[in-house]
Amino acid sequence: MLRHVLFVAVAMFTSVASAQSTARTQYTDPYGYFTTDAQYEAWYSLRARLATGFDDVCGDTFCEGDFSNIASLRFECSVQRGSGRIGSCVWSFAASSEEIVPTTGRIEVLQPTWQCPIPVAPHTTIDALLAALAGEDPLHAPLPGTTLSVYDGLTHCL
């Protein structure tokens, strides 16, 4: 009986400690963190300018190889609910390459995807990221707390 009570007490303590730890480090997408229209607008603008910047450089860089049609899917960051600190950011891409089989007329398609981690410095907040990348060329702007850019993250991925 005593052993059962002790087990239940330890299990309850572990559950409470785990719940508290999870509550402290709960992450969401930026939409779950933002509280002002200005934050939403800055995020939408950043994502659009990153996609445009990628399209502008793709033909001379990433899209010269086997896949000339690499397309930006989504730039996303995880944000700690309480502090606004970024957990990580990733930019997803997809492409295709089609080849016709001459003897059958069948089309073979390769459809690679990439999930490119962005080199965000520890303890960077989403608001600091938005401010640092607010200019005309967020693809090449230095990320907060580092000399690296979003573009640098892509060169190690695509």
Name the predicted role of every residue range:
Residues 4-13:
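Sec-dependent N-terminal signal peptides
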Residues 86-89, 109-111:
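Short, surface-exposed coil-to-beta transition loops
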Residues 121-158:
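C-terminal partner/receptor-binding element of secreted or periplasmic proteins
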Residues 14-18:
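N-terminal signal peptide c-region/cleavage motif recognized by signal peptidases
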